Amino acid sequence: MQTAPPSRSGSAARPAPASPRETVEHLEAALAKCSATEAGAGENPWRSLFYEHLRDEGLPALVKNDAVTPAGSLWTGARLWTKSFREFSLQAGDRIVLALPPSTAFVQVLVAALWEGLTIALVPPNDNIGGACAALDARGAVALKPGPFRWTADPYAGPASVPDVLRPTEGSRTPDVRFLVRTSGTTQRARWIALSDRNVLSVLASHLPHLTLQRARVLSVLPWSHVFGLVLDLLPALLAGAEIIRDPAGGRDPASLTALGEAWKATHLSAVPRTIQRLLATERGPALLRRLHGGIVGGAPVAGPLADRLAETHLRAGYGQTEAAPGIALGAPGEWAAHYMGRPLGCQVAVGANGELSFEGPNACVGVWRRHEGLDRRSPNRTVRTGDLVRREGADLFFEGRTDTAFKLSNGRFVRAGAWEGRLKRQFPSLHDVLLFAPAGDDVSVALCTDPSGPNSPSETAIREVLGPLAERLVGCVRIAPTDWVRRGKGTVDREEMTRRLRASQSAN
């Protein structure tokens, strides 16, 4: 099911994938098969795409641990999965959990499930698979280890084992939902978002023309169980006929990631800011980033110091949410500034009087899945509030904060922390981050994430000038090095843990 590795020099003859124009035309034709309501699903839009781009082709190809699987073998393995799904009488809209790591088997199961019109719930491989099946009322799962209602996967050739029976379900099928994807939970409690064919294909059609993926070698680090990795990393690379070089460590080991990118002469990389910061901290990582032809940095705001480094590359800003499948905005290659989000793409956006960004368009999710309740459907033509505070300069969007970071002081005063933090970061772009918190409930303190050896950080007097009327409640201004700033996996601040540590430190002092 595999071939020898393609020439890493790029000089050997490589099978020619479809041209970018042809790929976009195929996507637009697939999108035209999707209705806005998704009711009474008709022709499956994925079948023609995969038939054109995988069957009997050499590219795309997936490379992991130096094993190369060309498109034709991806197709053959997917047909084995299709056969198994049909033997178990799975029908369009039956829900299955896909809980494999990024791999050849993951792609084969994904293609087969899309071909059959199943509803695919994407779950990290080490999650509670049985719990996910119960929460999502799924018929079964494809997982690493055997268990009730589970398939396991051969690395390259279809199922390794099949379930004895499928799980009985309580609710109805969901043929108009193609993916159930969990939000990251970094800004609010994680939710299962329902995405339709139209949602995903509209983002692919709007974004792929900008990604310059023809004859690309994509260094893949993002989890494919998250919508950023699925829709803006894996699927574009597959449809564009790219070589997908999968990092087994998922970007967590910058030295091995750099070596992998150098060995395969990678041309593209999409990642969260924290992965980029790790690469920049290595000896050869900066050179690798400068050699790349393209890629998206998204998932978390990019502070001024990192934006300055990214301006030396061809990487671009990307912004979105799981609820937007996930495309809302995209920047140009090498166009960076502190907290830059890009320009709206594939949807319409508006900024409310309070600075909150909202969007509407074909990317707006079709609902939210609730345990014991099923699918809470949403109108596809609605306006979706993001909870993100932004400022708009012409067509460009800049991140200012979150609406859900507000808190009340003990005297009842309402502090919109996200808005104030945005003002401070805009006024002092050398700051990596800012956190407003209430040390004891009566007043506010400001924590500044700043380089100890970098430019002079703003004085407390300068901070007070920006805070205006809130300055009368300011009782402290603490400076913290980036290495001590507590972050989540994508690079966003862990507000709860950071506030706890700051309060404990101030109490001890």
Annotate each language-model stretch with its function:
Residues 201-217, 225-268, 273-278, 282:
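Conserved AMP-binding/adenylation subdomain of ANL enzymes
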Residues 361, 387-473:
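AMP-binding/adenylate-forming catalytic core of the ANL superfamily
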Residues 266-271, 277-336, 349-350:
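Gly/Ser/Thr-rich phosphate-binding loop
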Residues 41-44, 162-182, 188-189, 211-218:
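Conserved pre-ATP/AMP-binding loop-to-beta segment of ANL
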Residues 407, 435-438, 464-509:
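Conserved C-terminal "lid"/linker of ANL adenylate-forming enzymes
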Residues 41-42, 58-90, 97, 101-103, ...:
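Conserved AMP-binding/adenylate-forming core of the ANL superfamily
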Residues 343-344, 352-382, 396-398, 402, ...:
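Conserved ATP/PPi-binding loop(s) of AMP-dependent carboxylate-activating enzymes
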Residues 70-72, 178-205:
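Conserved AMP-binding A3 loop
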